[in-house]
Amino acid sequence: MIRGVLRNFRRGAEFIELVDISAEGCGFTSRWPFEVGARVLLGLPGLEPWPGTIVWHEAGQGGVQFDRPLHPGVVSRFAAQIKDAGPSRAHLTPPEKD
């Protein structure tokens, strides 16, 4: 499990669990809802705050699209940690739109 923080300028900081990551974005779980379209800064261990936008959030799961891609080495490091953490809730997908 990789714990992180999503900081929103309106609401402050909320703890999250990172469950999926790519160069373009990440999936997470949280106890608190996030508004789609909200601007956030992602804080992860050893990573400078990374800006992005909430692109979906439902039932405690959500996704962030980064403003700029993460370096492939950073993605590989966090992806390996997620894989090592086990199958918990990895590879979240946004709900289908009706």
Task: List each language-model region with its residue ranges.
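Structured alpha-helical
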Residues: 1-98
